[in-house]
Amino acid sequence: KPCCSIHDSSCCGI
């Protein structure tokens, strides 16, 4: 699944 998801928003690095 892509990064920046509702579950992995922190993996985006924002």
From Swiss-Prot:
Protein keywords: Amidation, Disulfide bond, Secreted, Toxin
Compartments (UniProt record): Secreted
One Gene Ontology MF term: toxin activity
Main location: secreted
Isoleucine amide: residues carrying this PTM: I14
Signal peptide: none
Tissue: Expressed by the venom duct.
PTM: Contains 2 disulfide bonds. Contains 2 disulfide bonds that can be either 'C1-C3, C2-C4' or 'C1-C4, C2-C3', since these disulfide connectivities have been observed for conotoxins with cysteine framework V (for examples, see AC P0DQQ7 and AC P81755)..
Gene Ontology cellular component list: extracellular region
Disulfide bonds: none
Family classification: Belongs to the conotoxin T superfamily.
Any further remark recorded for this protein: Negative results: does not have the ability to interact with the G-protein coupled somatostatin type 3 receptor (SSTR3).
Notes on the domains: The cysteine framework is V (CC-CC).
UniProt name for this protein: Conotoxin tx5b
Species of the source: Conus textile
